């Protein structure tokens, strides 16, 4: 079940660009990219997840554009069909935040999401 859930989440994030689980970012990553992590291993009911958007830029324009696409898709709930059920991705709180980075050539923002998991 967890493998199907992670596959579904990857499918969701990849529609906005290259996406990785936060612990599996390749060393030779190309910008922009998205990372995501789950706040729980227990996929019963609702789970909090967060994603970060990274851009190699001097402005937050690219980060904000990608964030807006993710926010728009999750605003009313985004359904992801998985084997044996579905996931529904909603906005969490706070929705979107800019993250200061010590490397001034990289811009980062993060989004909080809630995933409702319904499996048989």
Predicted regions and their residues:
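Charged, amphipathic alpha-helical segments and their flanking helix caps
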Residues: 1-20, 27-31, 35-120
């Amino acid at each position: 079940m967890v493998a199907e859930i992670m596959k579904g989440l990857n499918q969701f994030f990849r529609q906005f660009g290259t996406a990785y689980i936060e612990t599996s970012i390749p060393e030779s990553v190309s910008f922009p990219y998205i990372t995501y992590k789950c706040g729980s291993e227990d996929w019963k009911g609702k789970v909090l997840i967060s994603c970060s958007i990274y851009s190699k830029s001097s402005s937050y324009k690219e980060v904000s554009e990608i964030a807006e696409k993710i926010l728009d898709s999750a605003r009313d709930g985004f359904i992801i069909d998985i084997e044996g059920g579905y996931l529904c991705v909603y906005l969490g709180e706070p929705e979107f935040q800019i993250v200061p980075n010590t490397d001034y050539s990289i811009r980062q923002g993060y989004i909080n999401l809630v995933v409702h998991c319904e499996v048989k």
